[in-house]
Amino acid sequence: MDDDGFRNWGYYEPAAASSFKGNLGLQLMSTIDRNTKPFLPGRESNLMIGSNGSYHSREQDMNYSWINQPKDNKFFNMLPISTPSYSNVLSETSGSNSIQMIHQPVLNSSRFEENPIPPPAPCEEQTGKKRKMRGSIATPTVPKAKKMRKPKEERDVTNNNVQQQQQRVKPVKKSVDLVINGVSMDISGLPVPVCTCTGTPQQCYRWGCGGWQSACCTTNISVYPLPMSTKRRGARISGRKMSQGAFKKVLEKLSTEGYSFGNAIDLKSHWARHGTNKFVTIR
């Protein structure tokens, strides 16, 4: 003991071990007709008990204890202690009663799964299809009524009728009335004027609104037909031209002379002297 009268940690009473032999406080279960299972599967049930009914203790048991030393110098020491023998108790109980292990029911493993594996996320294509299906279910589309088409025979008949009507209807000639010397004259009925610069009369081309253009002469050359233009592909050199106002003056001059307008007018001596318009195409 210490100076204060307390027991030390290393104090050992051999008599204390013998006191456990009398009463261990074990409550053994009565034998019941149950399926007895060994404590360790795959081995003998009486593993702890040998063939002679005695308990096989370990070869060497070590107890860690503190040895009473001065307060200034304490160290950790190991002392071998003989373990109490329970051979008498186990031999008595092994003959009459066997230790029964209560079989506990297997708990549901789902309770212990704290972090279950989450299901795979749905693909974007599947979600898009689901959305389309939901939209189609929510708002059903009403089928549009198909337009009735006419049969081919009726269409052909109607097209032929339209074409015949278009062919029958002729465009009405526009009347161009000019007041010449106080007399209204329709120049649209006059014959096409000609030009005799090459020695033979050649009809002129219409130019502008009521004007005319020569097809055989320019200020430099007089030939029929006029040569092709080098600047404009597929067009000829433009001949001399006369506007509607200039042609009206020619008609006034000829009417004073008493010219008969039933004959074609020769424009050889009535062309302008300022040249030609090269951008006019002769066809």
Swiss-Prot record:
<comment type="similarity">
    <text>Belongs to the BBR/BPC family.</text>
</comment>
<dbReference type="GO" id="GO:0080157">
    <property type="term" value="P:regulation of plant-type cell wall organization or biogenesis"/>
</dbReference>
<keyword id="KW-0238">DNA-binding</keyword>
<keyword id="KW-0804">Transcription</keyword>
<keyword id="KW-0539">Nucleus</keyword>
<dbReference type="GO" id="GO:0000987">
    <property type="term" value="F:cis-regulatory region sequence-specific DNA binding"/>
</dbReference>
<dbReference type="GO" id="GO:0043565">
    <property type="term" value="F:sequence-specific DNA binding"/>
</dbReference>
<dbReference type="GO" id="GO:1990837">
    <property type="term" value="F:sequence-specific double-stranded DNA binding"/>
</dbReference>
<dbReference type="Pfam" id="PF06217">
    <property type="entry name" value="GAGA_bind"/>
</dbReference>
<dbReference type="InterPro" id="IPR010409">
    <property type="entry name" value="GAGA-bd_tscrpt_act"/>
</dbReference>
<comment type="function">
    <text>Transcriptional regulator that specifically binds to GA-rich elements (GAGA-repeats) present in regulatory sequences of genes involved in developmental processes. Negatively regulates the homeotic gene AGL11/STK, which controls ovule primordium identity, by a cooperative binding to purine-rich elements present in the regulatory sequence leading to DNA conformational changes.</text>
</comment>
<dbReference type="GO" id="GO:0050793">
    <property type="term" value="P:regulation of developmental process"/>
</dbReference>
<protein>
    <recommendedName>
        <fullName>Protein BASIC PENTACYSTEINE1</fullName>
    </recommendedName>
</protein>
<dbReference type="GO" id="GO:0003677">
    <property type="term" value="F:DNA binding"/>
</dbReference>
<feature type="region of interest" description="Disordered">
    <location>
        <begin position="111"/>
        <end position="170"/>
    </location>
</feature>
<keyword id="KW-0805">Transcription regulation</keyword>
<feature type="compositionally biased region" description="Low complexity">
    <location>
        <begin position="158"/>
        <end position="169"/>
    </location>
</feature>
<dbReference type="GO" id="GO:0009723">
    <property type="term" value="P:response to ethylene"/>
</dbReference>
<dbReference type="GO" id="GO:1901002">
    <property type="term" value="P:positive regulation of response to salt stress"/>
</dbReference>
<dbReference type="GO" id="GO:0005634">
    <property type="term" value="C:nucleus"/>
</dbReference>
